[in-house]
Amino acid sequence: MISLASWQLLLLLCVASFGEPLAKMAPVVNPEPTGQQSGPQELVNAWQKGPRYAESKPGAAGLRARRTSPCPPVENPTGHQRPPCATRSRLIPAPRGSVLVQREKDMSAYNWNSFGLRYGRRQVARAARG
């Protein structure tokens, strides 16, 4: 079965390349485009209307609109301006007056993964405890 299909495929390729045109072998019923397809000129026109083309043109930098912050800028006593709702550090600040936690100085007390990153503390053997 596979050899028969391969011979048919070989025959089709030979006829298509050396014989009659493909339109006579497998006629196309509707050669016109059925949907909205754009040719090369329409693609170029659409690209020229886009924002990237305007950025690449010389002298167009002043014409494009600047992105503004949703928050109005507030002037600090130092003279610098920054919006009042600007994102700050994502670190959670420690509450005032709290005592800092002393971390383990002995690095052998931690488990290490294959990338050299610390991922947990080693469990002390129960026999060593009691």
UniProtKB/Swiss-Prot annotation:
<feature type="modified residue" description="Phosphotyrosine">
    <location>
        <position position="110"/>
    </location>
</feature>
<dbReference type="GO" id="GO:0007204">
    <property type="term" value="P:positive regulation of cytosolic calcium ion concentration"/>
</dbReference>
<dbReference type="GO" id="GO:0060112">
    <property type="term" value="P:generation of ovulation cycle rhythm"/>
</dbReference>
<dbReference type="GO" id="GO:0050806">
    <property type="term" value="P:positive regulation of synaptic transmission"/>
</dbReference>
<keyword id="KW-0165">Cleavage on pair of basic residues</keyword>
<feature type="signal peptide">
    <location>
        <begin position="1"/>
        <end position="19"/>
    </location>
</feature>
<dbReference type="GO" id="GO:0008285">
    <property type="term" value="P:negative regulation of cell population proliferation"/>
</dbReference>
<dbReference type="GO" id="GO:0060124">
    <property type="term" value="P:positive regulation of growth hormone secretion"/>
</dbReference>
<dbReference type="GO" id="GO:0001664">
    <property type="term" value="F:G protein-coupled receptor binding"/>
</dbReference>
<feature type="region of interest" description="Essential for receptor binding and receptor activation">
    <location>
        <begin position="110"/>
        <end position="119"/>
    </location>
</feature>
<feature type="modified residue" description="Tyrosine amide">
    <location>
        <position position="119"/>
    </location>
</feature>
<comment type="similarity">
    <text>Belongs to the KISS1 family.</text>
</comment>
<comment type="function">
    <text>Metastasis suppressor protein. May regulate events downstream of cell-matrix adhesion, perhaps involving cytoskeletal reorganization. Generates a C-terminally amidated peptide, metastin which functions as the endogenous ligand of the G-protein coupled receptor GPR54. The receptor is also essential for normal gonadotropin-released hormone physiology and for puberty. The hypothalamic KiSS1/GPR54 system is a pivotal factor in central regulation of the gonadotropic axis at puberty and in adulthood.</text>
</comment>
<dbReference type="GO" id="GO:0007186">
    <property type="term" value="P:G protein-coupled receptor signaling pathway"/>
</dbReference>
<dbReference type="GO" id="GO:0030336">
    <property type="term" value="P:negative regulation of cell migration"/>
</dbReference>
<dbReference type="GO" id="GO:0005615">
    <property type="term" value="C:extracellular space"/>
</dbReference>
<dbReference type="GO" id="GO:0016324">
    <property type="term" value="C:apical plasma membrane"/>
</dbReference>
<feature type="disulfide bond">
    <location>
        <begin position="71"/>
        <end position="85"/>
    </location>
</feature>
<dbReference type="GO" id="GO:0043410">
    <property type="term" value="P:positive regulation of MAPK cascade"/>
</dbReference>
<keyword id="KW-0027">Amidation</keyword>
<feature type="region of interest" description="Disordered">
    <location>
        <begin position="52"/>
        <end position="91"/>
    </location>
</feature>
<dbReference type="GO" id="GO:0007200">
    <property type="term" value="P:phospholipase C-activating G protein-coupled receptor signaling pathway"/>
</dbReference>
<keyword id="KW-1015">Disulfide bond</keyword>
<keyword id="KW-0964">Secreted</keyword>
<dbReference type="GO" id="GO:0043025">
    <property type="term" value="C:neuronal cell body"/>
</dbReference>
<dbReference type="InterPro" id="IPR020207">
    <property type="entry name" value="Metastasis-suppressor_KiSS-1"/>
</dbReference>
<dbReference type="GO" id="GO:0033686">
    <property type="term" value="P:positive regulation of luteinizing hormone secretion"/>
</dbReference>
<keyword id="KW-0597">Phosphoprotein</keyword>
<dbReference type="GO" id="GO:0046697">
    <property type="term" value="P:decidualization"/>
</dbReference>
<keyword id="KW-0732">Signal</keyword>
<protein>
    <recommendedName>
        <fullName>Metastasis-suppressor KiSS-1</fullName>
    </recommendedName>
</protein>
<dbReference type="Pfam" id="PF15152">
    <property type="entry name" value="Kisspeptin"/>
</dbReference>
<dbReference type="GO" id="GO:0031773">
    <property type="term" value="F:kisspeptin receptor binding"/>
</dbReference>
